[in-house]
Amino acid sequence: MATPKRRMSRANTRSRRSQWKATKAELVGVTVAGQKHKVPRRLLKAARLGLIDLDRR
């Protein structure tokens, strides 16, 4: 694992960390048993197969 040669200041550490941003999951419409739901794209197949309870929120 890489280790730093010199100590990084608190300001530099925080400005580096602030560049990492969480992105919002894109919701895709899916119709299951005649009802329309919006789910994240990565859960689309599981929603169609009935592995996810879409009525519970």
From Swiss-Prot:
Pfam families: Ribosomal_L32p
GO molecular function, one term: structural constituent of ribosome
One GO term of the biological process aspect: translation
Signal peptide: none
Biased composition, class Basic residues, residue ranges: 1-19
Cellular component per GO, a single term: large ribosomal subunit
Record's keyword terms, sorted: Ribonucleoprotein, Ribosomal protein
Residues covered by region (Disordered): 1-20
Alphabetized HAMAP family for the sequence: Ribosomal_bL32 (MF_00340)
Record-stated family: Belongs to the bacterial ribosomal protein bL32 family.
Name used for this protein in its record: Large ribosomal subunit protein bL32
Gene (name only): rpmF
